[in-house]
From Swiss-Prot:
PROSITE patterns: TPP_ENZYMES
Domain of life of the source: Bacteria
Record keyword Ligase present: no
CDD domains the UniProt entry points to: TPP_PDC_IPDC, TPP_PYR_PDC_IPDC_like
Originating organism: Mycobacterium ulcerans (strain Agy99)
Residues engaged in binding Mg(2+): 446, 473, 475
Gene: kdc
Name recorded for this polypeptide: Alpha-keto-acid decarboxylase
Alphabetized PANTHER family for the sequence: PYRUVATE DECARBOXYLASE, PYRUVATE DECARBOXYLASE ISOZYME 1-RELATED
């Protein structure tokens, strides 16, 4: 059975589909992204009728997955609905990115009825061989938990998968057949169990003793990264940083995790590509705490970090180490609290962080001066205000912003590990839906935007007013810098970007083209004044101009090692 038999919206029977929605709502999900298909239509009726959860339809399944990712980064849980086969495979890239970047997304796939599957018929959206678990098996590689829901065990399996997603901060997969979705059941009898926890008192005691011995009377330095955010250990990290004068930095992946306006904030650490004062402070620290740090190629200067394990306390998700001695099971929050207590109890006040003399900033460009990368990112950072959510697509946008300090209260989102270009445009939709009270700022290259631009009209339909800066550098600039400076494969078709929003259904917007500094300044000033409108700024830049940090990274690469476009 693949088509509607009755009007589920008027059916008073409580179903497995309702149970799933109630569990998602319990974890803070109030919007679900997706694309309708005949295998999920009845379930969508239940979403529309739900008292808390709202349906947000997307232009395609890939964009829906990206939007769910952006939503999940801010809300701590999200969901996307697709249809069997053609729909779910379209979302696979997005789900894999969420897995790589530790984002909790529940992927709900509407499937054919169990009877139809059991008959092994050649149904549409299948491979025609009677095997309906091809795609379920694919999902095992890119999700932390999966379930092909059956009537008798559906509720228990829903709870299991959702709890795994919540615990591991990675996607889960639910195959919800049409007949299982409508199967009668009872509402949840109790809330989901709290996070299991996993700290051994003995491991904590031994870790604390070893950490105290290593720290002694040394000043501590901290390098933090995104897992602190994903594991909701920011308060514990902030308590550690306030227990003494603690110089600290983040990787690009964890940018905005900490207050970048703090006097103790060193900057962004990127291995050999770091600013020299930051590199020395991290690599020569008497004792270094690495909290939630994952060194990937694109955030570590291609693994050029020089961290001495003998002087390092490494705090991970479920285990920590002191000078390579491992202590487990030990949760991140507990380990951070232990280090904060060590600093508080020792009664020593460390000296202030040595701040290098401030270099004079660049002079304000002439209004008629043609735009370049430096002007663009400097002026954009001036335009940011507390509360903004900034998404920078992988390429010149991400690396152009990485070195700039953000105002307190700004959230920065990138995708430096998975690095799927175009991700940030739908992810910006998800972020804006998650927090409509915070203005979203999207920074994306022209080539990347061409992949996912269909979602622009959804912003307008949802009443959202982002600022979108399209970096028009006439093609794939990062690839030009790596290889093929004049090769035709790094060219793209030129679009009239100021005409695009209207063509895609945006009804309340301002679109401007900036070729010089004065036009950029005017556009960003107008964006600040037009808080209730989408503002699209096409920033025209030289095709071979790249930010200094990206230039530093690209200079040390062979072509297969680098990624990102525009």
């Amino acid at each position: 059975m693949t088509l509607l038999e009755n009007d589920a919206a008027t059916d008073p029977v409580y179903t497995v589909g309702d149970y799933l929605l109630d569990r998602l709502a319990e974890l803070g999900v109030s919007e679900i992204f997706g694309v309708p298909g005949d295998y999920n239509l009845e379930f969508l009726d239940h979403i529309v009728a739900h008292p808390i959860i709202r349906w947000v339809g997307s232009a395609n399944e890939l964009n829906a997955g990206y939007a769910a990712d952006g939503y999940g980064r801010l809300r701590g849980m999200s969901a996307v609905v697709t249809t069997f086969g053609v729909g779910e495979l379209s979302a696979t890239n997005a789900i894999a990115g969420s897995y790589a970047e530790h984002v909790p997304v529940v992927h709900i796939v509407g499937g054919p009825s169990k009877d139809a599957q059991g008959a092994r018929r050649a149904l549409h959206h299948s491979l025609g061989d009677g095997d309906f678990e091809h795609f379920f098996r694919i999902s095992r590689e890119i999700t932390c938990a999966q379930a092909n829901l059956m009537p008798a065990t559906a509720c228990r399996e829903i709870d299991r998968v959702i709890c795994e997603v919540r615990e591991q901060k990675r996607p889960g997969y639910l195959l919800l057949s049409t007949d299982v979705a409508r199967f009668p059941t009872e509402p949840p009898g109790a809330p989901l169990p709290p996070l299991a926890g996993g700290t051994s008192p003995r491991a904590l005691s031994l870790f604390t003793r070893a950490a105290a011995d290593l720290i002694g009377d040394h000043q501590l330095t901290v390098l933090a990264d995104l897992l602190v955010h994903r594991l909701q250990a920011i308060k514990e990290l902030e308590a550690l940083l306030s227990a003494d004068v603690v110089p600290h930095a983040t990787l690009m992946w964890g940018k905005s995790l900490l207050d970048e306006s703090s006097a103790n904030f060193l900057g962004i650490y990127a291995g050999a590509a770091s600013a020299e004062p930051v590199r020395k402070a991290i690599e020569q620290a008497p004792v270094l705490v690495t909290a939630g740090v994952v060194f990937t190629d694109m955030v570590s200067g291609f693994f050029s970090q020089r961290i001495d394990p003998a002087r390092t306390i490494d705090i991970g998700q479920y285990q920590s180490s002191v000078a390579d001695q491992v202590f487990a099971p030990l949760e991140m929050g507990a380990a951070l609290q232990a280090v904060a207590t060590i600093l508080t109890k020792r009664g020593i006040s460390s000296p202030p962080v040595a701040v290098p003399p401030a270099e004079p900033g660049p002079p304000t460009p002439r209004r008629d001066e043609p735009l370049n990368q430096e002007m663009l990112w400097n002026r954009l950072c001036e335009a940011l205000t507390p509360g903004n959510v900034v998404l920078a697509d992988q390429g010149t946008s991400f690396y152009g912003m990485a070195d700039h300090r953000l105002p307190q209260g700004v959230t920065f989102i990138g995708q430096p590990l998975w690095g799927s270009i175009g991700y940030t445009l739908p992810a910006a939709l998800g972020a804006a839906v998650a927090h409509p009270d915070r203005r979203t700022v999207l920074l994306i290259g022209d080539g990347a935007a061409q992949l996912t631009v269909q979602e622009l009209g959804i912003f307008s339909r949802e009443g959202l007013s982002p600022v979108i800066v399209v970096v028009n550098n006439d093609g794939y600039t990062v690839e030009r810098a790596i290889h093929g400076e004049t090769a035709t494969y790094n060219d793209i078709v030129s679009w009239r970007w100021t005409d695009v929003p209207g063509a895609l259904g945006v009804t309340n917007h301002l679109a401007m083209r900036a070729e010089n500094y004065g036009e950029l300044d005017d556009a960003l000033t107008a964006a600040a004044e037009q808080q209730d409108r989408m503002v699209v700024v096409e920033a025209v830049l030289p095709r071979l101009d790249v930010p200094p940090l990206l230039d530093e990274l690209v200079g040390s690469l062979s072509p297969p090692e680098c990624g990102g476009r525009s």
